[in-house]
Amino acid sequence: EKLFDKAKKKWEDVFNNDEKIKLSPSHLSVCVSSLQNVKLFNSNLEVIDDAFEYLVNKSSKGEKGQYFTPRYVIDMCVKMLNPKKDESMIDTASGSCGFPIHTCFYVWRSIYKERGIEASHLFTAQEKISECQDYVKEKVFGIDFDEKSVRVSKMLNLIAGDGHTNVLYLNSIDFDRWDEWVKDDEDWQDVYFEGFKRLKNLRVTKNQNRDFKFDVLMANPPFAGDIKESRILARYELGKKENGKPQSKVGRDILFIERNLDMLKPGGRMAIVLPQERFNNSSDKYIREFIAQKARILAVVGLHGNVFKPHTGTKTSVLFLQKWDDKLCPKCEDYNIFFATMNEPSKDNSGEKIYYPLLDSHDHLVVKHDLFHPHLEGDEPIKQKDESQEEFDKRIQEYRLNVEKYKDLQKDGIAEAFIEFAKAENLSFWKE
């Protein structure tokens, strides 16, 4: 209890003041004895995701169509969109905050490389240099309307060592009520006000919460459930009929497409995970036409049907867009689009991840997928403090032999193919 009281004081925006440990002494003893020697810092995000997902009610998430995005899907999106240190980024359905955290990792590595500093494993308690801290504090945001998910993401951000104050408990879709929500909820203000104030600085104009000036947006919005409230539907082009009146209901993910485009500045780019039907159904043609009017379609990457198992077998694709802009993305009618399909399932039919029988440089299992090149050959093990030189040399030799053994680990993946395409197309965010 004393440790928990200290934690509440230190991390006020993660734990409420009146929070109690809701376990009996005997159950608490079992948990502590099992977890006391587990190191979360410098751990594997995949493992931590699996653990933290149990903290979010699975049945309620399933009803909302919300599922944590596998880290390898996140990494593919981040690599393809190539966020920069001077660019702002947001996830409008942030869940466990995978997209923001991995965007931080990607940008931090570029900052360390630029400064000639060797980057350690970034998911650690090690204090980051001021430039990295400033980037997170001013540029990276997450929004989610599931309070448990927000708290989980704050915990993950805390473990990752980045700024968790910009993870906000808000309804991205119902932006008209943000100010009303903030004004009437003192508890909300205590936890989220500073992050909300920074978010407001990125609005296109004051006193409105529709249009923002983000450079990069990545999101995996909930698929299940329709929005039926006419007040909300009336605020969206995709929520109206041809005569201008609100439709009776619209899929939640459909409104997220429009909402996300409104969050981007002209020339801004985004990746959004969508159900495959949005790309194929004849009844969804109006959605595709709306997208083409607002942005350039950069790429469509079909994910394997097992990616979101065991929670759902829904077939999904990732849509990559860049908002039209006279300078960064001049509007045109005829242009090339990158298409790719994930061939390696990454999970079996029961939803268990498929791994290579080898560990990476941080002793983490490597998931078998073809979304990007893992570059294990350039990420060799680091000598441990209590490890002799002989033991270290042996470990490196075994590591190199394993990497050489699995030839498909040497192949470029979908992300690398897109980067080559983007450079050939002279896309603004991949210009050398």
Q: Model-flagged regions — what are they?
A:
Residues 1-58:
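Long recognition/docking surfaces used for binding and targeting
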Residues 46-68, 79-82:
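S-adenosyl-L-methionine
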Residues 43, 84, 303:
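Residue-level signal for short amphipathic helical patches enriched in basic/charged
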